[in-house]
Amino acid sequence: IGRGVYGREAVHMNIESDLKDQAKNKRLFQETLTVMKKAWTEKFFSHKGEFYTYPAPNFIWQHEMSPPSKEFLDTKTNEIKKISVVPKPKQNPHPPIWQVVDGARSIEWAAQNGLNTIMWIPTVKALKKRFEIF
């Protein structure tokens, strides 16, 4: 996964990204990762954040072939309260996540959040320094 530090990447990944606001882009990336992990690890999930709301508010269950369930909707109103993603990953709790990193803050964040790292082609000296940070 990558945050998209260049315009050609960031703006095509999410319309909310802003090349002039890297702090916002970082929050967007972090929330995207949170949603992705929820989708992989929870049978049914919901999320309400700065950028995403799942499921969409006021969405009514209208699927006659599948019975409604209190696991994912309000049975009185038929409003969907949670959604699921299928198939779930085979790996538990989810596949290993690799993040492309370059700067010290990104390396530290990846390490603190249990992500593996992919580093651009640094010199051996720079690579040693990055490994120390991780």
Regions found by a protein language model. Name each.
Residues 1-113:
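Internal, glycine-rich beta/alpha segment that forms the wall or movable "lid"
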Residues 102-131:
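A conserved active-site cap/scaffold subdomain adjacent to cofactor or substrate pockets
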Residues 12, 129-134:
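Short low-complexity, flexible loop/linker segments enriched in glycine and/or proline
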